[in-house]
């Protein structure tokens, strides 16, 4: 099913975006302290 592949790909993309956001927030917090 192509829909499952699209959903899994979207989930992977969302997870990577959240990971980069958390990484940037932690980096900015380290620079603030």
Curated annotation (Swiss-Prot):
Any Gene Ontology CC annotation: cytochrome b6f complex
Superkingdom of origin: Eukaryota
Keyword Disulfide bond: no
Protein's UniProt name: Cytochrome b6-f complex subunit 6
Assembly notes: The 4 large subunits of the cytochrome b6-f complex are cytochrome b6, subunit IV (17 kDa polypeptide, PetD), cytochrome f and the Rieske protein, while the 4 small subunits are PetG, PetL, PetM and PetN. The complex functions as a dimer.
Function: Component of the cytochrome b6-f complex, which mediates electron transfer between photosystem II (PSII) and photosystem I (PSI), cyclic electron flow around PSI, and state transitions. PetL is important for photoautotrophic growth as well as for electron transfer efficiency and stability of the cytochrome b6-f complex.
Membrane spanning stretches: 4-24
Membrane topology: Single-pass membrane protein
Cellular location(s): Plastid, Chloroplast thylakoid membrane
Family classification: Belongs to the PetL family.
Keyword annotations of the record: Chloroplast, Electron transport, Membrane, Photosynthesis, Plastid, Thylakoid, Transmembrane, Transmembrane helix, Transport
Main location: plastid
GO biological process: photosynthesis
Organism: Pinus mugo (Dwarf mountain pine)
Annotated disulfide bonds: none
GO molecular function, one term: electron transporter, transferring electrons within cytochrome b6/f complex of photosystem II activity
């Amino acid at each position: 099913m192509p829909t499952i592949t699209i959903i899994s790909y979207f989930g992977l993309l969302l997870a990577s975006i959240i990971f980069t956001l958390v990484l940037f927030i932690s980096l900015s917090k380290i620079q603030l302290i």
